[in-house]
Amino acid sequence: MKKALITILAVFLLGVGVFFGYEYATEPKIVDGVMSKKIDDKGRPIGLTSTFEPGDTVYFSAKRNRFWIDKAQIVWYKGEIAPENRFLVEEEVIVNKAKYFSTELSVPEGLEEGHYGVTIYVKGSDIMETKAEFDVKK
């Protein structure tokens, strides 16, 4: 009886361990992509928004969800998020102290009015982790 109970308990614990290990490995490694008007001293987004004016500096931030991820690639799009609409690719974006990947888009003559998008990938991966979209209006 005691041996059977120990065996059942061991199988149950192994199953729970496999389940949580699978969940941990397959969930997104970078989450919560947001657009903001500022970034604080620690690197967290402030003033979340999805609408900007042409002269604004646009900030994109996404939170790291796995401790071993320290570099990312961020891609900016003009229009729909599609390969042909890419206009800026930022390689080697490093996680900050607040555990966010953050970058900014600033154009001296101002951004054109329209719809934009941003995606983020773990460095070396083709799998999009999260995205955000925003509009530029006068």
Please annotate each region the language model reported.
Residues M1-A4:
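Positively charged n-region of N-terminal signal peptides that target proteins for export
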Residues I6-T7, E90:
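General helical structural elements
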Residues T7-F19:
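Hydrophobic membrane-insertion alpha-helices, especially the h-region
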Residues F20-V107, L111-K123, I127-T130:
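Contiguous segments within soluble domain cores/interaction surfaces
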Residues E133-K138:
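Short beta-strand edge segments in extracellular beta-sheet folds
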